[in-house]
Amino acid sequence: MSHSYPNVLVHCVFGTRERQPLIPEEIQPRLWRYLSGIARGHKINLLECGGTNNHLHVLLVLPSDMPLSKAVQILKANSSRWLGEQGINFAWQEGYAAFSVSASQLSSVRAYIQNQAAHHQRRNFEEEFIALLRKSGVAYDPKYVLG
């Protein structure tokens, strides 16, 4: 085969430093748009972006020559710098979670990310994160999972 045709969908989640509410609600739509532009500039296909004041979800397709860790580093570093330029003392927590998404689940994962505000009226980030790890079969140590 002379060409590559990857379509690996990845749902990534990362939290703010110490899961503090560092992303003001009024700036969130601008941050999501900014992240979309950063992704586009690095040939990352960002399909969905959303979150709350203390964490972010992104659904993306990576270029075939980019490791996931590099994509996350690009998104986290650029968004941290941009939030700092907005006058916010900001940092992301170290690390991230990443989950593969089947094409058949694309619309439900997109809806899940779009509805973060409503979702978090019923469940906090810690509960959500643990549930995502369990649902995906990711082994974790409860003492260390959230830093």
Q: Which residue stretches match the model-derived regions?
A:
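Basic nucleic-acid-binding interfaces
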Residues: 1-147
